Amino acid sequence: LLKVLFLENDSLEYIPFISNDPVFPTIEYGMDTKQINDKNQKLIEENKALFFDLVKQKKLSLTVHNESGTLMQQVIEESRFADMMLVKSSMSLSYEDDQNPTSFVKQVLAKAECPVLIMPEDSQTINEIYFTYNGSHSSVFAIKHFSYLFPAFKYLPVTVLYVSEEKNDQEDKQINDIRELLYAQYKHVTVKVLQGTAEAELFSELALKKNVIVTFGAFGRSTISRFFRKSSTNSILQTIDIPAFITHP
């Protein structure tokens, strides 16, 4: 069952107003509630019509919820009863939020009670799977949940990116364990051991990839959260243009 949330943001935008003073013209910002509401309502109705046309073409079964008020709370409550949530990395409740991922998306990642699939702007066919793995409970948790949700992907090639940031006596065992788990579900599995910092190594591996999907084991609860912080190379989600499956125990 596909469930769709239409979220209506109650916050207002600032609109520029130019003064009529011919000598000292100024620009001030104010709120034109009627203009904003009319513009937003028209856009909402147009997007809904496009969406329902697509659903009809694809012959999908779905339920629709129209949500307003405390939107984050509504989203999290809905996630409790969902197998997975799809969110665009650019989704925002504020016209000023130009981060990628946005503040809204970061909150969803940290608070959602189901896996979240962060979608790039343009859809793409998935031809390969990348699992990030460091032996932790959260990384295995993400891999297992992804496999449960996408059984049709079992014939796609899988690459496990194992990042070894420091000497680890359990490395061989951890690699053998993940191989054993994945060989039972996938036909083509490769484990690639990366040496160095997780951010740099994963960025190097994923930066130029297309038509792939990647899993991360946590957000805000382990070193995985570092990938989404601003840095000299920007956040990994801003730089890589591929779907990212993110969840935490």
Which sequence ranges carry the predicted segments?
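Small/aliphatic-rich secondary-structure junction motif
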Residues: 1-31, 111, 124-193, 211
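Generic structural signal for helix capping and beta-alpha/helix-loop junctions
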Residues: 11-14, 72, 96, 126, ...
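A short acidic, glycine-rich active-site loop
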Residues: 27-43
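Conserved hydrophobic residues forming the short capping helix/wall of the S-adenosyl-L-methionine
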Residues: 51, 55, 179-182
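Gly/Ser-rich helix-loop-strand patches that form or flank binding pockets
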Residues: 64, 72-122, 206-209, 213-249
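Charged docking surfaces used in two-component/phosphorelay signaling
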Residues: 66-73, 194-199
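A short, acidic, amphipathic alpha-helical segment used as a generic capping/interface helix at domain edges
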Residues: 179, 196-208
